[in-house]
Amino acid sequence: VQYIVVKIGNEQYGIDIKYIDNIVRSQNITRVPKTQPYYKGVINLRGEICPIMSMRLKLGLEPDELTDKTRFIIVKVEGASIGVIVDQVKEVVTLEEEDIERISRSTNDDAAANYINAIGKKDGELISLLDIVSLIVENN
């Protein structure tokens, strides 16, 4: 399975490539009033309105600082597109089944743990594999 490895805060996360529609540089976000704090607003993506979500806030981390490495990853889930803000896109990795260790849902208070469904091992590094569907569909 191929994953895009991204950096969010100090951690590396993997997003299954089958959900990724596009990766774009950060751009102006139009705020939308009365929405969840992690919902940053919308952008105009080739004439389409695309909502943007802060992965940092959703995962219980410090608010985003947009830099020249910041990217919006446009994911398509259940027919809808949504952009997620990541601090950096690192690489594409291919993980074999034996490189992936499934983990059960956490019952602790760590927000990030609720959205990680496996840990991938690549060249001695650990990559938390995000359950991007539950991350986006929940509460939206």
Question: Regions from the language model: what does each represent?
Answer:
Residues V1-N140:
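An acidic, low-aromatic, low-complexity terminal/linker signal
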